[in-house]
Amino acid sequence: MDPSAALHRRPAGGGLGAVSPALSGGQARRRKQPPRPADFKLQVIIIGSRGVGKTSLMERFTDDTFCEACKSTVGVDFKIKTVELRGKKIRLQIWDTAGQERFNSITSAYYRSAKGIILVYDITKKETFDDLPKWMKMIDKYASEDAELLLVGNKLDCETDREISRQQGEKFAQQITGMRFCEASAKDNFNVDEIFLKLVDDILKKMPLDVLRSELSNSILSLQPEPEIPPELPPPRPHVRCC
């Protein structure tokens, strides 16, 4: 039943009855339309060594903020943002994981439910690039083989201190089946939106055609806040990716 119809319905006795507070002043107050629910809920995980800028990338995308001296993530943190892409409204839950090995037993539980994985290294620190094979082993062991992969060389704003060339990043990504590559700067807000939106777009491309609208719409960011509900902790299930 339409709630507004109940406001105008007369009592059974035929009298007007008490005036509803909503009708005081002579006119009913128009109710706000509830926001359209999300068509999809997608989970994305950001991984990489300590200090590569995982938290900065997440916060730049979700809140458009940048912290010069962010504290290292302990275990797992997350943010939620709603985006519209390909005519669909997607509630994107982004998990920011700790880069220290002592947290691996905690963060590994988040891999299996992730539809997309962003692997980040610092272009100014060779050791973070050298750690990439270790992170790929984590992906092979815990992530779904259908998860979309994106390699990101972060801190492009520190170009003069670069230790890893763009060609090195591209070469690594080319060795992994289905992995995309790009460089970005959370500080300068360069390529940050593109990272997440391209990843979501690749995920949507894998979904059955009957759940997608035939017409494609431009990417529109929705900044409406979402309730922050702690993510679920699925049990890890070993799975090896075929490369």
From Swiss-Prot:
Tissue expression pattern: Highest levels in skeletal and cardiac muscle. Also found in comparable amounts in brain, spinal cord and lung. Also detected in testis where it is expressed by Sertoli cells of the seminiferous tubules (at protein level).
Binding of GTP, residues: 51-55, 72-73, 99, 154-155, 157, 185-187
Chain positions with N-acetylmethionine modification: 1
Motif (Switch 1): 64-78
Motif extent (Switch 2): 96-113
Pfam families: Ras
Compartment(s) where it occurs, according to its Swiss-Prot or TrEMBL record: Recycling endosome membrane; Lysosome membrane; Golgi apparatus membrane; Cytoplasmic vesicle, Autophagosome
Topological relation to the membrane, as annotated: Lipid-anchor
Modification(s) after translation: Phosphorylation of Ser-105 in the switch II region by LRRK2 prevents the association of RAB regulatory proteins, including CHM and RAB GDP dissociation inhibitors GDI1 and GDI2.
Known cofactor(s): Mg(2+)
Positions of modified residues (Phosphoserine): 20, 24, 105
Residues covered by region (Disordered): 1-36
Entry's Gene Ontology molecular function annotations: GDP binding; GTP binding; GTPase activity
Record note on domains: Switch 1, switch 2 and the interswitch regions are characteristic of Rab GTPases and mediate the interactions with Rab downstream effectors. The switch regions undergo conformational changes upon nucleotide binding which drives interaction with specific sets of effector proteins, with most effectors only binding to GTP-bound Rab.
Family: Belongs to the small GTPase superfamily. Rab family.
Stated name of the protein: Ras-related protein Rab-12
Gene name of the encoded protein: Rab12
